[in-house]
Structures are given as structure tokens and as C-alpha cells.
């Protein structure tokens, strides 16, 4: 049974988002009564909201995901503005993945890892086993051909994995999860972007101080000035926020 731990749902521009109070609430919801939920986890930030608005294929992919949660602080602020009584906090995708892996290790939940460079994936597997004794039942780096996809789906199914995390970037990872679930729906799928790189130290996140201030985007911009065009696109989201169009 997986119904006793609930979470409210909120609408932002037609997307139905889960409102988790904190990380513990998220874990308890996903592992309700010790039974892991099945479906697809997708992190929602301002950039993803814009992609949904501009690309019908992306909208269809995101709308089909069972569990959409507020990964970006701007989305959290929009939820609180639209729903003043909402008790919702940011649950960063990278942090949720680590917490989920720790819980999976404690519960003995079988995990399949997809995506990333070969050396990064190998390091990720090693650290997960050393740190939390995660039961990794299979893995595949991100360098596979379209012709190999069906065989990979079958490997995931045959492994009996109950958590499948996919680090391929959006929307490629959402397409992969949608297609794999058609063959093997009995798992929790999670799109994790560049999380393996962060976990293994190849990419550094903003210090917690910057994260707490909601300035992680600005920290990344300082390190990568080439991101400025992407940041300018987010002005449209700010307009939605301040004009009540969310």
C-alpha cells in the first residue's frame, strides 16, 4: 500500500506540481509505507517551465510524468505567491537523488544507473556502493546508439530495478524514461541531468550560502559567462511571476 503519505498538488501554467514540505517529506512520500512508488520524477525550474511553454513535445513529456516537483527557487516562490498557505520548499534534484540513493541503500532497493561519461558512471557506482551500500543491479553510460535502446530497456526490465536514474539532459532523458516505462513500468524513474558529475566532484555546485539565498543561478553565471543568453530568457518567467500569469 502506498497511500498514507500524501502531498498537496499545485498548478503553475497548467502543470500540476507536488508540494513537498522538505526532503524528509519527499522521501516519506516516495517510500510510503516502505513501498516505493512507481512513475517518473521530473524536476521543475524556471527554465523547464519555459521549455514546456515553447515546445509541445516537451509539454507532453512533462505532463505525462507522475511526480513533478519544485527544483528551482523561482518556482517555489511562484507557488508561495499563488498559494499563500502552501507549505512547500525547494527540493533540489541533486539532493533528492543523493537522499534517495541513501534510502535505497538502507532498504536494499535495486537501482539501475543510466547516462554520464563512462569514467564518471564508474566512479558514481563505486561511491554509491562504498558510501551507502547501494544495490546497483545494472548500469549503462550515455554513449549508446539508437539501435541499442531496446536492448537497454530489456536489460533494465530483466534487472528487476525499482529505481532507474537517467543522466542524459533534458528532454533526452524524459524521452528515454517515457519509452522505457512502456516496456517496464514497475519502477521509479528519475531524470537527474548532470548529477553524476556533481556527485563525483567533476562539477561543483554553488556553496550552500548561495543556494540558501536562491542565487545558485548567479554563481553558475559567474563561472560560465556564456550562460548569459540563457539567463536573459528567464526574464519571461519573471514577467509571468510578477504579473500573476502563473
From Swiss-Prot:
GO terms for biological process: enterobacterial common antigen biosynthetic process. GO terms for molecular function: lipopolysaccharide N-acetylmannosaminouronosyltransferase activity. Pathway: Bacterial outer membrane biogenesis; enterobacterial common antigen biosynthesis. Keywords: Glycosyltransferase, Transferase. Transmembrane segments: none annotated. Pfam families: Glyco_tran_WecG. CDD domains: Glyco_transf_WecG_TagA. The keyword Transferase applies. It catalyses: UDP-N-acetyl-alpha-D-mannosaminouronate + N-acetyl-alpha-D-glucosaminyl-di-trans,octa-cis-undecaprenyl diphosphate = beta-D-ManNAcA-(1->4)-alpha-D-GlcNAc-di-trans,octa-cis-undecaprenyl diphosphate + UDP + H(+). Its EC number is 2.4.1.180. It comes from the Bacteria. Catalyzes the synthesis of Und-PP-GlcNAc-ManNAcA (Lipid II), the second lipid-linked intermediate involved in enterobacterial common antigen (ECA) synthesis. Belongs to the glycosyltransferase 26 family. This is UDP-N-acetyl-D-mannosaminuronic acid transferase. It comes from Klebsiella pneumoniae (strain 342). The lineage of its organism: Bacteria, Pseudomonadati, Pseudomonadota, Gammaproteobacteria, Enterobacterales.
Amino acid at each position: 500500500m502506498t497511500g498514507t503519505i500524501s502531498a498537496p498538488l499545485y498548478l503553475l501554467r497548467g502543470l500540476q506540481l507536488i508540494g513537498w514540505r522538505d526532503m524528509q517529506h519527499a522521501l516519506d512520500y516516495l517510500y510510503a509505507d516502505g513501498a516505493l512508488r512507481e512513475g517518473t520524477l521530473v524536476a521543475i525550474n524556471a527554465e523547464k517551465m519555459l521549455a514546456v511553454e515553447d515546445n509541445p513535445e516537451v509539454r507532453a513529456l512533462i505532463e505525462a510524468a507522475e511526480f513533478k516537483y519544485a527544483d528551482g527557487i523561482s518556482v517555489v516562490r511562484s507557488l508561495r505567491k499563488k498559494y499563500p498557505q502552501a507549505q512547500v520548499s525547494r527540493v533540489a534534484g541533486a539532493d533528492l537523488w543523493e537522499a534517495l540513493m541513501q534510502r535505497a541503500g538502507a532498504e536494499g532497493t535495486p537501482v539501475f544507473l543510466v547516462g554520464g561519461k563512462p569514467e564518471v558512471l564508474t566512479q558514481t557506482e563505486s561511491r554509491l556502493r562504498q558510501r551507502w551500500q547501494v544495490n546497483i543491479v545494472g548500469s549503462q553510460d550515455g554513449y549508446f546508439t539508437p539501435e541499442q535502446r531496446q536492448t537497454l530497456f530489456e536489460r533494465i526490465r530483466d534487472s528487476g530495478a525499482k529505481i532507474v536514474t537517467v543522466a542524459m539532459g533534458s528532454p533526452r532523458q524524459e524521452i528515454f524514461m517515457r519509452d522505457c516505462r512502456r516496456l517496464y513500468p514497475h519502477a521509479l524513474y528519475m531524470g537527474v541531468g548532470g548529477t553524476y558529475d556533481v556527485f563525483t566532484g567533476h562539477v561543483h555546485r554553488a556553496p550552500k550560502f548561495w543556494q540558501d539565498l536562491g542565487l545558485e543561478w548567479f554563481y553558475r553565471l559567474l563561472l560560465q559567462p556564456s550562460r548569459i543568453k540563457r539567463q536573459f530568457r528567464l526574464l519571461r518567467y519573471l514577467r509571468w511571476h510578477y504579473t500573476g500569469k502563473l
